[in-house]
């Protein structure tokens, strides 16, 4: 018979008491009243925060957007096909956040920062809130460094600086994405991290852009955030904020970043869909009342950090689509008022073969020449005025039969300048090449050539200058000034190349 010793029993009881875990886990739960169209109505969830993540029984995540007196309106981050009426929901106590790290470079991810390129998981050790406050006034400094796009029309007349927000606006199929992707290609070797956010686009279009980046070696410094047209509205609405959080991660590490939102019209439409389904009152064009805040809180995150914060920068190029050139619609006017200028792409110019189809007359950069190197200021100062006068003259010349010699000369010069601004896609130019091109046009060296010969001559001149007068490029890149020596070298090269070119044409 086993004898029971009292001291052993007391030891066992004491051990049990010591191991007893008094921690009580409180979970805030609710039940689904109604679900459908990417929206769920939840009863309960008494202490849920606005924007808090909630988790359904079958693991779908949602965001609590509407906090009403008797229920909570939740938008789903998934199809939610397995969610049933009466199933339970629990609040997670977290606001939407994503993991961030340098390992995201070269990857294609979705709005939840999950990789969708089939190249495995991304290792991260840090996370950032998707929505974080924009830098304050003290944390910023004024924009002073240029961010070269590689497009002559933009870098000479509508310059963009690091930390600026410049809107790209135009009808569908006018080359808006091409301007943005060319800008990314031109950042090669410039130590700029690029984030391309595709919102509500065709998967084939996004694949095309990614392939082009890979072929040109641009994916090394680029992150693509993609939510295609078949994604839930919630994810299309979140995608730009995810991109901004990734760009901010690098900005606060004293790096320069460029972020492209392609396009914010689709994000506004996704937000409108969510708001109407949540029964929020519609306003102008059926958009909810806070659609301005939707874009302002996103674009205000782009900044040039002060020297105290390491002078990093985040440059934003939002894209907005217009309907038959109507810039006075709701979303275009909102975004124009938030940004520091706009590049207007015209369908008429595009169809007339002027590409990039930038309407220089109504495009503007509110940073202006502060975002240009001295050499570009010296050369391009008169260009915008000359083109504006030419456009006016051209309209007038359609009605006049006999024009005086001076007017004819001005028209001829304008036609050649317009020819210089044409550029094939995915062929960005260096600043030195742009300066050479503009100088050649504005100083009348092309006036003797036929319009059809202008581009051929300029291409040959670029090659000639590179091989025979390489000092020109060195002077501009080192001094950032169009010195007398550089001008003499360029004049020499133009004259030598012009002689060769005319001989070739005669042969």
Curated annotation (Swiss-Prot):
Q: Name one GO cellular component term.
A: proton-transporting ATP synthase complex
Q: Its Gene Ontology molecular function terms?
A: ADP binding; ATP binding; proton-transporting ATP synthase activity, rotational mechanism
Q: Which CDD domains match?
A: ATP-synt_F1_alpha_C (cd18113), ATP-synt_F1_alpha_N (cd18116), F1-ATPase_alpha_CD (cd01132)
> What EC identifiers does the entry list?
7.1.2.2
Q: Give the membrane topology, semicolon-separated if more than one.
A: Peripheral membrane protein
Q: Site annotation (Required for activity): which residues? A: 363
Q: Does the keyword ATP-binding apply?
A: yes
Q: Which residues bind ATP?
A: 170-177
Please give the coiled-coil regions recorded for this protein: none
- Keywords, alphabetical: ATP synthesis, ATP-binding, CF(1), Chloroplast, Hydrogen ion transport, Ion transport, Membrane, Nucleotide-binding, Plastid, Thylakoid, Translocase, Transport
> Which InterPro entries does the record associate with it?
ATP_synth_asu-like_sf, ATP_synth_asu_C, ATP_synth_asu_C_sf, ATP_synth_F1_a_nt-bd_dom, ATP_synth_F1_asu, ATPase_a/bsu_AS, ATPase_F1/V1/A1_a/bsu_N, ATPase_F1/V1/A1_a/bsu_N_sf
Its predominant location is plastid
Compartment(s) where it occurs, according to its Swiss-Prot or TrEMBL record: Plastid, Chloroplast thylakoid membrane
Name the domain of life this protein comes from. Answer: Eukaryota
Q: Which reaction does it catalyse?
A: ATP + H2O + 4 H(+)(in) = ADP + phosphate + 5 H(+)(out)
| Protein task | Produces ATP from ADP in the presence of a proton gradient across the membrane. The alpha chain is a regulatory subunit.
What is said about its interaction partners and assembly? F-type ATPases have 2 components, CF(1) - the catalytic core - and CF(0) - the membrane proton channel. CF(1) has five subunits: alpha(3), beta(3), gamma(1), delta(1), epsilon(1). CF(0) has four main subunits: a, b, b' and c.
Family as reported in the entry's similarity comment: Belongs to the ATPase alpha/beta chains family.
Among HAMAP family, the record links this protein to: ATP_synth_alpha_bact
What is the name of the protein in this document?
A: ATP synthase subunit alpha, chloroplastic
State which gene encodes it. atpA
């Amino acid at each position: 018979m086993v004898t029971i010793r009292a001291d052993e029993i007391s030891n066992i009881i004491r051990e049990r008491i010591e191991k007893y875990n008094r921690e009580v886990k409180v979970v805030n739960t609710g039940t689904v009243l109604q679900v459908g169209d990417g929206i769920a109505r939840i009863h309960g969830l008494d202490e849920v925060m606005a924007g808090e993540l909630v988790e359904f029984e079958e693991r779908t995540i949602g965001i609590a957007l509407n906090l009403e007196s008797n229920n909570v309106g939740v938008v789903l981050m998934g199809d939610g096909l397995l969610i049933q009426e009466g199933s339970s929901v629990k609040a997670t106590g977290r606001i939407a956040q994503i993991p961030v790290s340098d390992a995201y470079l070269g990857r294609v991810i979705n709005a939840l920062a999950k990789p969708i390129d089939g190249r495995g998981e991304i290792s991260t050790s840090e996370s950032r809130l998707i929505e974080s406050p924009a830098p304050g006034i003290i944390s910023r400094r004024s924009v002073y460094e240029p961010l070269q796009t590689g497009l002559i029309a933009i870098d000479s007349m509508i310059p963009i600086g690091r930390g600026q927000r410049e809107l790209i606006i135009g009808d569908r199929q006018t080359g808006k994405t091409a301007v943005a992707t060319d800008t990314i290609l031109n950042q090669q070797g410039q130590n700029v991290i690029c984030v391309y956010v595709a919102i509500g686009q065709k998967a084939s279009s996004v694949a095309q852009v990614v392939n082009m980046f890979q072929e040109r070696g641009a994916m090394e410094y680029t992150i693509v955030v993609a939510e295609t047209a078949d994604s839930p509205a919630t994810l299309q609405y979140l995608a730009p904020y995810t991109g901004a959080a990734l760009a901010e991660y690098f900005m606060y590490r004293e790096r320069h970043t460029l972020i492209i939102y392609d396009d914010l019209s689709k994000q506004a439409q996704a937000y409108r869909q969510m708001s109407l389904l949540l029964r929020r009152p519609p306003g102008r064009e059926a958009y909810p009342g806070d659609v301005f805040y939707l874009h302002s809180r996103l674009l205000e995150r782009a900044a040039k950090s002060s020297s105290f914060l390491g002078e990093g920068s985040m440059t934003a190029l939002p894209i907005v689509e217009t309907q038959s050139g109507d810039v006075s619609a709701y979303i275009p006017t909102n975004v124009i008022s938030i940004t520091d200028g706009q590049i207007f792409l015209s369908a008429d110019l595009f169809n007339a073969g002027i590409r990039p189809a930038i309407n220089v007359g109504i495009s503007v950069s509110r940073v202006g020449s502060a975002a240009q190197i001295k050499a570009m200021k010296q050369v391009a100062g008169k260009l915008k005025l000359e083109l504006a006068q030419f456009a006016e003259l051209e309209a007038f010349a359609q009605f006049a039969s006999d024009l005086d010699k001076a007017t004819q000369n001005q028209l001829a010069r304008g036609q050649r300048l317009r020819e210089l601004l044409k550029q094939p896609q995915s062929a960005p130019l260096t600043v030195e090449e742009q300066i050479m091109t503009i100088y050649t046009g504005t100083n009348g060296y092309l006036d003797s050539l036929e319009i059809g010969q202008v581009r051929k001559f300029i291409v040959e001149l670029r090659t000639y200058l590179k091989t025979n007068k390489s000092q020109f490029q060195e002077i501009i890149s080192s001094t950032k000034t169009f010195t007398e020596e550089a001008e003499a070298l360029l004049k020499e090269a133009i004259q030598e190349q012009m002689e060769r070119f005319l001989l070739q044409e005669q042969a």
